[in-house]
Structure formats: structure tokens, C-alpha cells
Amino acid sequence: MRRSEPLDLLLLHAPSVYDFRKMSIFYGPISDMIPSSTVFEMYPLGFLTIASYLQKQGMRVRIVNLAVRMMKDWSFSVPRFLASQHPRAIGIDLHWLPHAHGALEVAKIAKEIHPGVPVIMGGLSSTYFHQELIGYPQVDYVLRGDSTEAPLVQLLLALRNGGALDKIPNLTWKQSGLPRINPLTYLPPSLDYADLRSDLMVEMVLRYRDLGSVVPFDGWMWNPITAVFTVKGCAYECATCGSSHTTCSHLTQRTQPVFRSPESLVANIVAISRLIRGPIFLVGDLLQAGMDYAESVLQRLRETTVENQVVFEFFDLPPVAFLRRIDSSVRHWSMEISPESHDYEVRMAQEGESVYDNEQLEQIICEALRLRCTRLDVFFMIGLPQQTYQSVQDTVAYCEHLFAISDRRLSCFISPMGPFLDPGSRVFEEPEKFGYRVFARSLEDHRRLLVQPSWERILSYETEWMTRAELVDATYDAAESLNQSKLKYGRISTRRGQAVANRIRAARDIRTRLAANQNQEVDAGSALEGEIEKFSASTICDKRELFWSRHLVNFKVREILGILYRFYSKGLSEKSV
């Protein structure tokens, strides 16, 4: 490709709140259980599958993580940057609902600077709110569903060549200012059509001389977590999940999960391992597709030389025999499981299909730790149906019990569900049935909540069993107790544990002072600006607990040199903008 060739698609990832550099919002722990910060700067994996698929079609794509650029350089101007770009189309993700503010603001700026350039939005939240979204003047198109790569190609070609739009599947668009909704009919029966290509990220860095725009989240270079999709859709019915079977049936029209073939899945794992030494997450439970499928994946992994940590996610308890098969097939492996609560009744109130008691959970934990499992993370949630304040504290006591019967490879985490209920989830659609009171129904409702002064007021729900204030109390009390248990059983160092304890105390103090000045929100927030920023990260745990041990060198130099050679031999380098 030559420098003069136009950019077919500029993919932009916005911060959660566009004005985060100017506003003092006390986010608390809402991002403590994910790799990114309260800016929610991690772009969806779909950016990489889109870029990979479009490149195969001869199209040119650039990913720009505006959130990271804005975080790393406070003088970075989004309008000035966008004015320097000349794409044929602009794509903006609204996948996770916490981007409701930033995504719309970036779209507005893009449309003001490039009024003739179409703005396309996509993602699960875009899919749910597509009719409301298309009503915003800055949004021209919304692509619905969980696999929009092929419809996106059709749309870009139609826009370039003047083709008809009414035949493009999954598209919501405007005609003479009025919304048009094409049927959501594109549902690929396999996920083999697009890879998560880490080498494509390197090529973008080389082409634009711009590392900051491509990194998935701030700190990724030090902790290069990677992932591959194993499935889209789900067989389970968890009431709080925005990707449950019922939700997918209505939202993306998937009435059953679709899986990536074992051959394609393992080939993608191997390709990632050639470049990156970090852990590789298998997104989704392999056992959803059946034991034969899962065994086939393990057999192919056994035949590879992958040295990365391979992280297995389980929605239900895996059979002991399957854990042993993992142990004999994968050199380095870890596992994650999310019982959500220690309380069987609370767990059952989710109305999912995984039914196990604590004794069975403990048997699997002990078996995994008897094997070569490097790390075992157990996740619990606050804000569930039928969950009381006392139940949350009892869950933390159960975590201490798990520490007592295990070793340092096991860790437990607990966090509030939020800041929003998942749109399309059963609790979102039937809040009264599950005991919820919701404070946001529309996209605009959620956008407005995001700029409230504290996470207590950002929360989009409360339950029959806990108000928003009680959810916050339960969170800080649980975090404090869990931190003490981690110190007691050596899960974290004294230094880190003390730092977490100090942050929890400071967060409580900030909450009290904000509440005392709730009628003077702006002044109170401005007065606490430095403290709010400092104590809105690693509040309820040290975020470093989420990451695996670092390597001295996280990337494989030989593979990078190979990419460099192939890249420059084709004359693809361009001057950075």
C-alpha cells in the first residue's frame, strides 16, 4: 500500500467519559476487576477481528485508542488529531455501556470535523439501543449483532460505490432523516473466519509510528494479556448476564452458541505465542461445546510447543478427569471460575443452569491445585438477587475458608456488579421479578449517570435487599475483610495489603465528604480532585493481583524482526500523524 491510498476505516475507541481530564468523578472500584482503568480504555477484541477481516478484503484499517492517547498525554487534542485524518469512514465502538458518554461525544466531534464522512457504530450496547442511537445526528449507521465483519465490508463497499443499503444485513440506517432497520440475518455458523492477529498490531505501529494508539489498555506493554474467542452466544441463563442464552436469542438472534473449530482456535493460540509471552485467555467455557470438542482442543494443544500460560474459563465445575487432561496437555495453565456467591440460594436465584454446592467447588479447587495449575482465581459479585449485606460478608468469610484449604496459587476477588446492569439481561428486562429497582432504561439515561459525582450515584440499580448506599457499604466492608484475609494467608505482601487498606479508608473518607457537599457537587468534586483521581484505582484490591508474573522480555524479538522485514520489504511504512 502507498501513502496516497485512502484509509477505508478509522476505528476509534473513546474513554468512558469524554471529559474525564476535566471532571472530578469518584469512580471507586468499578474498574478494579478488569485490566483497564476507570477510563475503560480497553477496546473490544472485535477491533482486531474487524481489522484482520477487512485487511483480507484489501481494505485499509487503522485502530486508534483515543482513551489511551488522552490518558498518556493530557495535551492530546482529539479534534486536532481527527482533523489530521482523512478516512472514508469512521467506526466507533459502543460495546460496553460505560462508554455511552465518550462514544457519543467522539462521534459528535468526528461529525463536526468531517461532516461528509459516515460515522458507524457497533457493539452489543449499540445493538440493544440501535433505534435510540440512530436518532443522534452524529450517528449515520449502526451495525447490529456479535459478528459484523462481513456486513461492515458490504457497507463500506456500498458507501464507496453508491450501492443499495437496504440489502445489507444487520444494518440500522437513515433514509431522508428517518430510521431504517434491516433484518438481523447475518449469523456466521463458525468463528473461523477472522483471527485476533497480534502481528497486525505490530504492523499498525510500524505504519503509523504510533504505539500508543494500538495498545489495548494502559500498561499492556508490561502485562500483555491476550485472548482468543472460543464461542459467541451461551447455553446458560444467568439472570444478570448480558450474554445469556435468552439475551443472545433476542439481542443477536443466536438461539444457540457458535464455536470456533479446534483447529482454528489452536492455530490462533500458536500464532499469538510466536510473538507474545503473556497469558492467553480462552474466552468462554470449552465444555459448552461438549467433551469431544474440548478434548480435541487439548489434543491439538498437546501437539504444540506453546509455553504461554493458557487460561481456562469455566461456567460450571469441570470434571476432575478433564482437569487432569489439561494438566497432561498444556505446559502452563491457569483457571478461573465465578460462583458469584458462597450462598447456594443466592447462586440459584441467578436461574442459571450450573448447579453445584460449595463442597463440590472445593473438591475441584483442591484437585486443580494437586495438579500443575499455576493459578486459580475465584470471583464473587455484589448486587445479586436475594443477596443481603450479611450474605456479602459471609462470602468473604468463605473466601478465608478457601485460603485455609489451599495454597498461594488460589486467590479470591469480590466486586460490585456495575456500574450498570447489562442491557438485555433478564434482570434488566424483568427487574421487578428479580427484585431490582433500575435508575436507567434508555441510552441517554446511562449517558447522564456516567457524569454523576460518585460511583454510588452512577450505579444504575439497587435491589430489594440493598440500596445503592448499602451496596457501597457492603463493597468497602467486604474489601476490607478480604484484604485482611489475603494478608493473613500470604496472598499479598504486607506492603501491598497496607496500601489497599489505606486506599479503602481514603475512599470512605472521600465518599463522606462528597455526601456532605451533595448540593454543591461541582465545588466538592473540584476540591477533592487530586484525591478522587488517586483513590479511584485499586480501591478494593491491588490491580496487580489480576496480572500474571511478568517476563524479563514480554515479546519475542525474532518474530518482531521478521514482521519488520516483511513490512519494510513491501514499502508500507508511513509517516506518523
Locate predicted features.
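Flexible glycine/acidic-rich beta-alpha junction loops that bind and position SAM and/or redox cofactors
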Residues: 19-20, 129-130, 236, 248-249, ...
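Canonical Radical SAM [4Fe-4S] cluster-binding loop centered on the CxxxCxxC motif
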Residues: 218-261
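Glycine-rich beta-alpha loop elements in corrinoid/cobalamin-binding modules
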Residues: 53-57, 62-190, 424
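Conserved SAM/AdoMet-binding glycine-rich loop
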Residues: 3-12, 120, 261-375, 382, ...
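Catalytic cores of alpha/beta
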Residues: 130-137, 386-401
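N-terminal [4Fe-4S]-dependent radical SAM core
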Residues: 2-5, 21-24, 174-230
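Radical SAM enzyme core and accessory elements
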Residues: 1-7, 11, 60, 82-85, ...
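Short glycine-rich His-centered loop
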Residues: 7-39
